[in-house]
């Protein structure tokens, strides 16, 4: 395989359509605006080209029932308690269920995962022993979570099998599962390195793939080694397939790289990129000395009302030490970081998700995509160095438009500079946390 980097990417047409959505304007505009006109233009183009992807449901569908999904999917959606699609689901699902390629940037917690899970399940006609759907993501925990979403929405589709593959586990077990027609999956969720290894060793046949999804695509494609892995996997799939890419952040530099994998994609950008802050999330900072962090953290955990909290630190050592300190101070906590064994990480993630513990101390391994609905408080014990990573971190609280609270400790000149960059990048004012505290109703759901 060539190592020429970007030049080695497959050249696909990037004659894309684009939908820019500003949430406030979309709310005012109701059922008019750029989304409708762009969709009409796409319908005309497809008609002229003899597109076989089917007719579209109106892009401003207001309920999941308007998407005309399979009865099995509709039942599962009702069981999950979902009634109305989020903004990103409303604008994407009507076309994605018919096989249109998608490039989607939307803030954390707006239901991007459900877009590709529902779209691929809607199109899936399972054939024993054939992989029809491939989903690639950058983190093992995220792969595990996506697999769980597939299980949740396919509960009334008993013939559909889903498997998750990631590094750190014996590849022989994956090979055994794939070889057996009784266990061979129709849907594969995987990290790039492990899936590439399965392809190279011919343990997996991707010649029947109809849907190719990359979640957190900016993170997957910005690292050259990971991008090369994806290219090798991509080449093992048919040329005629649907490709969908999703992320909360998509820089101008990464977009052309994404587009090379796509054919005439629908581009959805929910809210202007500079305003990717989370609706319903209260954001504050606390200025303090490094030595004051532990005392202030204990005070916050005592004073604030929360269901679950995630506390971000900058290193594995600090994660372990802070967790020990919290447990010794009668704050039962669990820690998750990248240096523990894979089985242990998954077990701890599951324990936290199942509400066995209310406090989790983590490095950035939990900073992207991980969706635990009870988290309504995120604390940056150590502030991140990157503005985009701040968004992913605080996005763990206030998922899918719910309320939440994010507090960042600022203890150095570097932290102050990062805070200024965050406010400039996302066009948001982050206030100093009031000494008297804040009203719980501003960050707690009724």
Swiss-Prot record:
Q: CDD domains given for it?
A: DEADc_DDX39, SF2_C_DEAD
> Which InterPro entries does the entry link to?
DEAD/DEAH_box_helicase_dom, Helicase_ATP-bd, Helicase_C-like, P-loop_NTPase, RNA_helicase_DEAD_Q_motif
Catalytic activity of the protein? ATP + H2O = ADP + phosphate + H(+)
**Keywords of this entry:** Acetylation, ATP-binding, Helicase, Hydrolase, mRNA processing, mRNA splicing, mRNA transport, Nucleotide-binding, Nucleus, Phosphoprotein, RNA-binding, Spliceosome, Transport
Location of the protein in the cell: Nucleus
Q: Name one GO molecular function term.
A: ATP binding
* Record domain Helicase C-terminal: where: 280-441
Give the PROSITE patterns listed for this entry.
HELICASE_ATP_BIND_1, HELICASE_CTER, Q_MOTIF
Keyword Membrane assigned to the entry: answer is no
- Looking at the record, which segments are called Disordered? 23-52
Residues involved in ATP binding: 106-113
Identify residues that carry Phosphothreonine.
169
Q: What residue intervals hold the motif Q motif?
A: 62-90
In this UniProt entry, the residues modified to N-acetylserine are 2
Q: Where is the composition biased (Low complexity)?
A: 23-49
Checking SUPFAM superfamilies in the record gives:
P-loop containing nucleoside triphosphate hydrolases
GO CC annotations on file: spliceosomal complex
| Keyword Hydrolase appears in the UniProt entry | yes
Q: Name one Pfam family in it.
A: DEAD
According to the UniProt record, what class of enzyme is this? hydrolase
Could you describe the subunit structure of this protein? Component of the TREX complex composed of at least SUB2, TEX1, YRA1 and the four THO complex components: HPR1, MFT1, THO2 and THP1. Interacts with HPR1, YRA1, and YRA2. SUB2 may mediate the interaction between the THO complex and YRA1. Associates with growing mRNP complexes during transcription. This association requires the presence of HPR1. Also interacts with SAC3.
According to its record, what is known about the domains?
The Q motif is unique to and characteristic of the DEAD box family of RNA helicases and controls ATP binding and hydrolysis.
Q: PANTHER family under this entry? A: ATP-DEPENDENT RNA HELICASE DBP3 (PTHR47958)
Q: Which family does it belong to?
A: Belongs to the DEAD box helicase family. DECD subfamily.
**What is this protein's record name?**
ATP-dependent RNA helicase SUB2
Q: Which gene encodes it?
A: SUB2
